[in-house]
Design a protein with these regions (language model features):
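ABC ATPase nucleotide-binding domain helical subdomain, centered on the C-loop/LSGGQ "ABC signature"
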Residues: 1-3, 18, 36-77, 122, ...
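Conserved catalytic motifs of ABC-family nucleotide-binding domains
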Residues: 28-46, 82, 142-143
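ABC-fold ATPase nucleotide-binding domain signature/coupling loops
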Residues: 3-8, 61-90, 108, 112-115, ...
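ABC ATPase nucleotide-binding domain "signature" region
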Residues: 83, 90-95, 119, 135
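Catalytic Walker B motif of ABC-type/P-loop ATPase nucleotide-binding domains
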Residues: 103-106
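C-terminal portion of ABC ATPase nucleotide-binding domains
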Residues: 66, 115, 122, 130, ...
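A short, proline-enriched helix->beta-strand linker immediately N-terminal to the Walker B motif
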Residues: 97-101, 130
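ABC ATPase NBD Q-loop/coupling interface
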Residues: 1-16, 118
Length: 182
């Protein structure tokens, strides 16, 4: 049985599940409008202070605040006027605006540089400690501090444990980690 906060997932309606789960895909999806309008897809009633806070956690506030219009900056369809990393950070911020109990990050930091990735993970830990986070990543540094790591290879689970345990017990994980550290 799959449980969310101790409750059988089947006891939730689809709408109530959508309210407690935030999903951030690898390919960021933005629509034409303003940054604020895109972020409010997470919670239509969110105020500007809440949007700013989510942007700060997601490491998006620095570039948003540097524009002359801030949260009211126009976004083109698909976010073509933004870099891949900026789009990913805004998509993460949008999920945070929704106050998820479960946050799924599906390789959604792949376009970020290592320093931004690290700071984003630090902020998620500091500001959202009570939120369960599932991070899917091909970057070992993005998940090495996770409580639990599940290693998949060719569609099969080949390892499970902490970073230190997997370095010893899982050749696939150890190879990935050592290759990426070179």
């Amino acid at each position: 049985t799959v449980r969310i906060y101790g409750e059988d997932v089947r006891s939730y309606t689809l709408d109530s599940l959508r309210q407690v789960i935030g999903v951030v895909p690898q390919k960021a999806s933005l629509v034409s409008g303003t940054i604020a309008e895109n972020l409010r897809w997470g919670d239509a009633a969110a105020g500007d202070a809440e949007l700013e806070h989510a942007c700060k956690i997601a490491q998006a506030w620095e570039f948003v605040s540097q524009t002359s219009e801030g949260l009211e900056t126009k976004v083109t369809q698909g976010g073509r006027s933004l870099s891949g990393g900026q789009k990913q950070r805004l998509t993460i911020a949008r999920a945070l605006v929704g106050h998820p109990k479960l946050l799924i990050l599906d390789d959604s930091m792949s376009a970020l540089d290592y320093a931004t990735d690290l700071e984003l993970r630090r902020q998620l830990a500091a500001e959202m400690g009570d939120v369960t986070k599932i991070m899917i990543s091909q970057r070992a540094t993005s998940i090495q501090h996770a409580d639990h790591i599940l290693v998949m290879d060719d569609g099969k689970c080949v390892g499970y444990g902490t970073h230190d345990e997997l370095l010893v017990q899982c050749p696939v994980y150890a190879d990935i980690y050592h290759t990426q550290m070179q």
